[in-house]
C-alpha cells in the first residue's frame, strides 16, 4: 500500500477507534524494524502496564523482553505530564544514547489533551515530532479518533494532520452482520500510495492486509452498501418503467 513502506524520518499518525488495531500495528512496526532491518525501537505508552504489553506481543510471537536484553528495544511507561515537562528530551535522551533507535511508537497523543489547552496541543505535538526528527527517528503516533466518518475525524479538529507525513486510518465496520476491519492511507507526503480502502485481519502473526472493499461504498461513513446490487436494482427499476 505504501509502495515500499514509510520513508526514513517520517512522522506517521495512526488514527482509529478503540479495538481497531492501532497498538498491534505500532508494535508490528517496531518489531519489523528490529527483525528485518536491524533498527532498534522504542515503545512509549501512557496507558498500558508493561506486563500487558509484553504478554500481548508474545501472543504474536514477538519476544520484547529478549529484544530488550539484546539492546534492540525499550519499553517506556510514563505519564503525559512528565513528557510535556521534559519536552521529550530529558525523558528520552538517555535511552537514545544507549539504544541508538531508528523508530519510536507513542501510544497515544490523545492523552496529551488532558494536560494542555486545546490550542496548545498542536504546538506540543509539533515540538515532540521536531525533536524526534532531529534525532533521526521515524515515529508512529497513535491517535484515539473516536467516531470516524469519511475523511473527517477528530485529528483534523485539533490540527495535527499538517505536522505529520502520513496518516493511516483504521476502523471496524459492520458488513452483512459481520464486523470487519478497514484500513486506508489518507495522506502520504512525497510518495505515491494505494488509495483504496482495504480489509485487514489480525492474525496470530500480526496484521495482514487483505483485498480492497471493491464491491462496497460508504464503508468509512458507517453505512456501507454493496455497489453492484444497487446498480442492478437501478437497472431493473429502469427496465420495468420502460415496459410500462
Where are the regions a protein language model picked out?
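Walker A/P-loop NTP-binding active-site region of P-loop NTPases
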Residues: 1-64
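Hydrophobic/aromatic beta-strand patches that form the interior of the parallel beta-sheet core
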Residues: 12, 42-44, 74-76, 140, ...
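Short glycine-/polar-rich loops that comprise or flank the Walker A/P-loop
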Residues: 9, 37-40, 71-73, 136-137, ...
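P-loop NTPase motor core
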Residues: 84-167, 175-179
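Conserved nucleotide-binding/hydrolysis micro-motifs of P-loop NTPases
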Residues: 47-51, 59, 79-84, 110-112, ...
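Scaffold/interface architecture of coatomer-like assemblies
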Residues: 3, 16-18, 25, 141, ...
